[in-house]
Amino acid sequence: MSAHATGANPFADTEDQAALRQLARDVADRELAPMARHGDETEEFPQWAWDGMRKAELFGITIGERWGGAGLGDVEAAIVLEELARADVSSAILAQLIFNGPPRAIEHLGNDTMKDRWLPIAASGEGLFCIGISETEAGSAVGHMRARLRPDGDGFRLNAYKNYVTGGHKARACLVWCRFPDSAGTKGIGAVVVDLEAPGVTVAGTHVKMGLRATSEAELAFDDVRVEPDDVLLWGDPANSESFKTLISHINHERCGNAAMCVGAAQGALEYAVNYMNERKLGDRTLADLQGLQWKIADMATQLEGARLLLQRAVHMAGPHGTPPALETAMAKTAANLAAKFVCDEAIQLLGGYGFSREYPVERVYRDIRGLCIGAGTVEIQRNFVGTSVLRGATPASDGWKSRRA
C-alpha cells in the first residue's frame, strides 16, 4: 500500500496494485482535487467526483465478477481510498460506501435475489448505497435502537427513524439495522435492504456539518415500509445476539476504509506542509532549515507511517475475501484517526495564518478528519474494545505479544 514500497517490505504493492493506485491517484488529481473547495463551500453533492470514479470503473473493485466487479479485497479498497482521500475526503466517502458499505454486506450475507438486484447497480456506479444504524437515542449504544419490523403476511413492515445516514439524500437503497419481532437489547437485531423509492420512505432532513460538507448526513424516516422476505439481509433471532455480532464484524471493512481515508488525507496535508516549508523564505533561509520545525515534520511523518503500517497489517490479514480481524482493525482505526488529527493540526500550525485560512486546503482537511474520528465507531469505542480485549488475554498478531501469564 505504501507509495514508496520496495524491496523486502511485506506490504509492498504488487504490479497490479501499483497500477490501481496510479489510476486512483490520476482520478483524484484530475476530478476530485480541483473541485474539493467548491464542494466544501456549497455543500453540493460531488457529482463530478462520482462521474469521474464511475468512468474509471473504480466502484466495482470489491464486488464479484459475476455482477460486473473485479472481485478484489480490503487491500485494494484501502489503496484506492487512500489516494482519493489525499485529494478530497468527502468524495472518497462515496467510494467507501460502495467498497465497504451495503454492497459488500449484500454480497457476503445476502440471498441470490438480493445480490442479482443490487450488486450490478453498485458495480457499475448506477446508484449510491447508504447504511442506517444511528438513531436519536442509539448511536454507539446500538442495543438501544427502536427501529422495528412487524409481521405483515409473508413479509414485514418497517418503522424506523435513522439519523446521520451518510449519502442518504442521494442513495438508491439503504441497509437498515433493525429489531426483528420480540427482541430486546442486542438480541434479535438484524438488517434489511430497503429501496429508498419505496412508499413510506422520506428524507426528513439533513445536518449542517463542520466538515465532510459535500457528503450529506440525512435523516431517513421509514413509515410502515413493506419489506419482502427477499429484502431480509440477516434475520435477527430474538433468542441470541449472533446476527448483531455478524453485522458488527462486517463493520471492520468500513473501519479499515475509514483508516485508509485518514492516512490519505493526512498524507496530503503533510505533503502540503513540506512544500510550503521548502518554499517559504526567511531571509536567506527557508522554514525547512529550522531544526524545531524539522522535528515537527519528523513527528508528523512518524505517526502517519505507524498508522499506515497498522492499517496494512489489518487489511492483509483479511486475505482476498475475508474480514479484517477486530482487534487489529480497532488499533488501526484508532492510530489512523489520532495520527491524522495530529498531522493536520500540526500542518495548520506550520502554515501559520495561511493554515487557518480557507484559501488553503489544510483547514478543510482538518475539519474532514474530525468527522472520520467519529464515524464507523468513535476513537473512544475502539479504545474500549482494544483495552478490554488485551485485559482479557487477547493479543494482536505480532509474535512479541506472547502471553506470560502463569
Q: Could you describe each region identified by the protein language model?
A:
Residues 224-245:
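Long, acidic (Asp/Glu-rich), low-complexity accessory segments flanking structured domains
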Residues 125-133:
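A short, Trp-centered hydrophobic/proline-enriched beta-strand micro-motif
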